[in-house]
Amino acid sequence: MEFDPTKINTSSIDHVTILQYIDEPNDIRLTVCIIRNINNITYYINITKINPHLANQFRAWKKRIAGRDYMTNLSRDTGIQQSKLTETIRNCQKNRNIYGLYIHYNLVINVVIDWITDVIVQSILRGLVNWYIANNTYTPNTPNNTTTISELDIIKILDKYEDVYRVSKEKECGICYEVVYSKRLENDRYFGLLDSCNHIFCITCINIWHRTRRETGASDNCPICRTRFRNITMSKFYKLVN
């Protein structure tokens, strides 16, 4: 089932945009609340309203090693403090339609969306977020800001992420030979990128290799090409996306 933007109803309360996707024939109703931070052109999505269980899953994931590493890398890449990657609107009478846990859209598209078992809802959620970002670009009007981002630029960026995601889904770890996205444990479904070459490894296998080499006093070499590396970067994709 393809995402259909004609089925979106848009409203707003205070600084929150509410997107309602209603497809009566297919019995689909999805509400997505989005906050746009104009200062750094960042979007925060309410995962509580999508499904209350997602907020609990996210809080648990954030405490695990994979979650902590991902949050650290995202904070570094975006320049946003980790504490500012999430926002909470408290539940009260005034906020009953918008309360919940809001998280950086990167976390929704690259992490949380994989926890949704319904592939149709996954597709619609991805479409809603991409549609909103493409139609709500904004550049602050300040003397120091001379760069503008067009809707076409945003679409190109989103297409690039989609292309990398599609390729990543098929990539196998060069050590265990399993498809990285198909590994049983959630924490294993990340790539460990070496700064020396482009060989593919899951984060778990390459970390074990790295630890074993250190313990035995051996140099940090790629298991395949033996090129020496200095850093391992944890990534949801098989390569870094600039």
Swiss-Prot record:
<keyword id="KW-0945">Host-virus interaction</keyword>
<comment type="function">
    <text>RING-finger E3 ubiquitin ligase which catalyzes the formation of both 'Lys-48'- and 'Lys-63'-linked polyubiquitin chains. Plays an important role in virulence by acting as an anti-apoptotic factor.</text>
</comment>
<dbReference type="InterPro" id="IPR016398">
    <property type="entry name" value="E3_ubiquitin-prot_ligase_p28"/>
</dbReference>
<comment type="similarity">
    <text>Belongs to the orthopoxvirus OPG021 family.</text>
</comment>
<feature type="domain" description="KilA-N">
    <location>
        <begin position="21"/>
        <end position="131"/>
    </location>
</feature>
<keyword id="KW-0863">Zinc-finger</keyword>
<keyword id="KW-1119">Modulation of host cell apoptosis by virus</keyword>
<dbReference type="InterPro" id="IPR018004">
    <property type="entry name" value="KilA/APSES_HTH"/>
</dbReference>
<protein>
    <recommendedName>
        <fullName>Host range factor p28</fullName>
        <ecNumber>2.3.2.27</ecNumber>
    </recommendedName>
</protein>
<feature type="zinc finger region" description="RING-type">
    <location>
        <begin position="173"/>
        <end position="226"/>
    </location>
</feature>
<keyword id="KW-1130">Modulation of host ubiquitin pathway by virus</keyword>
<dbReference type="InterPro" id="IPR045072">
    <property type="entry name" value="MKRN-like"/>
</dbReference>
<dbReference type="InterPro" id="IPR017880">
    <property type="entry name" value="KilA_N"/>
</dbReference>
<dbReference type="GO" id="GO:0039648">
    <property type="term" value="P:symbiont-mediated perturbation of host ubiquitin-like protein modification"/>
</dbReference>
<keyword id="KW-1128">Modulation of host ubiquitin pathway by viral E3 ligase</keyword>
<keyword id="KW-1035">Host cytoplasm</keyword>
<dbReference type="Pfam" id="PF04383">
    <property type="entry name" value="KilA-N"/>
</dbReference>
<dbReference type="GO" id="GO:0016881">
    <property type="term" value="F:acid-amino acid ligase activity"/>
</dbReference>
<dbReference type="InterPro" id="IPR017907">
    <property type="entry name" value="Znf_RING_CS"/>
</dbReference>
<keyword id="KW-0833">Ubl conjugation pathway</keyword>
<dbReference type="GO" id="GO:0061630">
    <property type="term" value="F:ubiquitin protein ligase activity"/>
</dbReference>
<keyword id="KW-0808">Transferase</keyword>
<dbReference type="GO" id="GO:0000209">
    <property type="term" value="P:protein polyubiquitination"/>
</dbReference>
<dbReference type="InterPro" id="IPR013083">
    <property type="entry name" value="Znf_RING/FYVE/PHD"/>
</dbReference>
<dbReference type="Pfam" id="PF13639">
    <property type="entry name" value="zf-RING_2"/>
</dbReference>
<keyword id="KW-0479">Metal-binding</keyword>
<dbReference type="InterPro" id="IPR001841">
    <property type="entry name" value="Znf_RING"/>
</dbReference>
<dbReference type="GO" id="GO:0008270">
    <property type="term" value="F:zinc ion binding"/>
</dbReference>
<dbReference type="GO" id="GO:0030430">
    <property type="term" value="C:host cell cytoplasm"/>
</dbReference>
<dbReference type="GO" id="GO:0052150">
    <property type="term" value="P:symbiont-mediated perturbation of host apoptosis"/>
</dbReference>
<keyword id="KW-0862">Zinc</keyword>
